[in-house]
Amino acid sequence: MSGLCFKGLARWAALLCSGLVIGLGVANSDADASFRIKEDSFSISNAPGYCFAMVAFARWYYLSRQGQPSLRKVLSPAAQLRIARELQEFYSQNLIKLQADYCNVHHANPSESFRRFLLGLLSGEPQIVLLMNRGSSGGAAVLHAVLAYEWLPERNVLKVYDPNYTRDERFIDLDKKWYTSLDITYNAICFPEVLNAHPALVRRMEYLYSRYVHRIGDQRLAGPIVRPTAPWQQSN
């Protein structure tokens, strides 16, 4: 699976951002979804390698909760671990090829892919970002997923939730050629919007939410009957 190198993306960013902001009538060019790492992300470690599941579920719940408490208040660490494990398995079995095909196609047209990515951020929706690196020995690509929630155009920087860091804001500097998470450096990037609201993925997250809800004593903060309704599912 190929992705756009950071150097190639950086030259599109400055050209696109000012035009998008003007076109949308946004006064402040900083795109901030108000996502908060210490509230809206998983509190568990990504040590088992569940990064995609963690960012996808955090995004879905953040956009769908409609007044419910934040993710860390709703789901216990044990429930978070079960959700992350089962959702990562679903992703690995059902969505890897879709993701690879999308990133390969849009590798040839980075400006349009990045434009849609920025439109999502400017509308207040965190966006899934895939990071890739192929080892010097030519082995299989190493993949990592983060969730972008704020765009700082004057610095050409994305603020992201990186599941390897449970309490810290992280930054992807698009002017650089790489991003390092723990001890792995990534040098290619993809914005897989095809996965943001994939119907099968959404259904799986709804199911896992209703199954592994956090309990305080006998009282549920939310339950299988009170499922979040995504904004795109609401009637006007």
Question: What is each PLM-predicted segment?
Answer:
Residues 106-160:
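Active-site-adjacent substructure of cysteine-protease-like catalytic cores
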Residues 34-112:
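Cysteine-nucleophile protease catalytic domains, especially the papain-like/related folds used
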Residues 13-24:
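Bacterial N-terminal signal peptides
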Residues 27-33:
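Boundary at the C-terminal end of the N-terminal hydrophobic targeting segment
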Residues 138-143, 152-236:
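Cys-His-centered catalytic/binding microenvironment captured across papain-like cysteine peptidases
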Residues 1-8:
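N-terminal secretory signal peptides that target proteins for export/translocation
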